[in-house]
């Protein structure tokens, strides 16, 4: 499948220390496994090292890579309280899209 036709996901990982990490991927299960991998191969995010256990707090499809990047950026601009508020409302896709378009 070509890069442009893949289905992209936005995901939030809850770390063992309670922090939240936001990312995008085409395969959430694979990406979580990469983040959890502690054998030093370097495929997980450096910011997650030492923050085990890692669990998926949220994930949803967002369509294109471009849309995923915009939504990821919008979520990363929120503080922890904002991310928690989004999670408590179950982060509906319309909310995410409006967040990503608010900077345009």
Q: What are the residue ranges of the model-derived segments?
A:
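Conserved C-terminal helical docking segment of ANL/AMP-forming enzymes
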Residues: 45
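A short, polar/charged loop-to-alpha-helix boundary motif
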Residues: 81-88
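GIY-YIG nuclease catalytic motif and its immediate N-terminal context
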Residues: 1-41, 49-59, 66-76, 90-104
């Amino acid at each position: 499948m070509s890069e442009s036709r893949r289905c992209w996901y936005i995901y939030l990982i809850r770390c063992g220390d309670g922090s939240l990490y936001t990312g995008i991927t085409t395969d959430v299960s694979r990406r979580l496994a990469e983040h959890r991998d502690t054998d030093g191969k370097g495929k997980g995010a450096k910011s997650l090292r030492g923050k085990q256990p890692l669990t998926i707090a949220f994930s949803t499809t967002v369509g294109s890579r471009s849309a995923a990047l915009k939504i990821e950026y919008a979520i990363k601009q929120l503080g922890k309280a904002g991310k928690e508020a989004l999670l408590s409302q179950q982060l509906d896709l319309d909310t995410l899209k409006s967040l990503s378009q608010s900077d345009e």
